[in-house]
Amino acid sequence: MIMKHLKIKIMSIAFMAVTTSSMAQSLNKMNWLNEPQQWEIKDGKTLVMDVPAKTDFWRISHYGFTVDDGPFYYATYGGEFEAKVKITGNYVTTFDQMGLMLRIDHENWIKAGVEYVDGKQNVSAVVT
């Protein structure tokens, strides 16, 4: 896949997450897919959100389901870019997660972050 010719959406998904970014992109100019009911931007650089239960991004899994309903806060980029975020959260339920997603469309994306499984925070990645 040649990424430099594609427009990619980048976001942070989170459960009770706080995402801080020092990138030039203003959080106030980003867009939502599946906007959660409760969210806010603090000090122009920190995104805080409450993610609805049982929402996620998962594609044709061995579990037998596909979902595309998690909160997705993104900016669209073409060509090369750099992303840097700090994530913290209140992990409570198995599969609570937060991180970054590079997304072309509902069938083509990569998400990487931290996921709560078996009472522990684990590094997690899903590639479609």
Language model feature labels by segment:
Residues 1-26:
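Bacterial Sec-dependent N-terminal signal peptides
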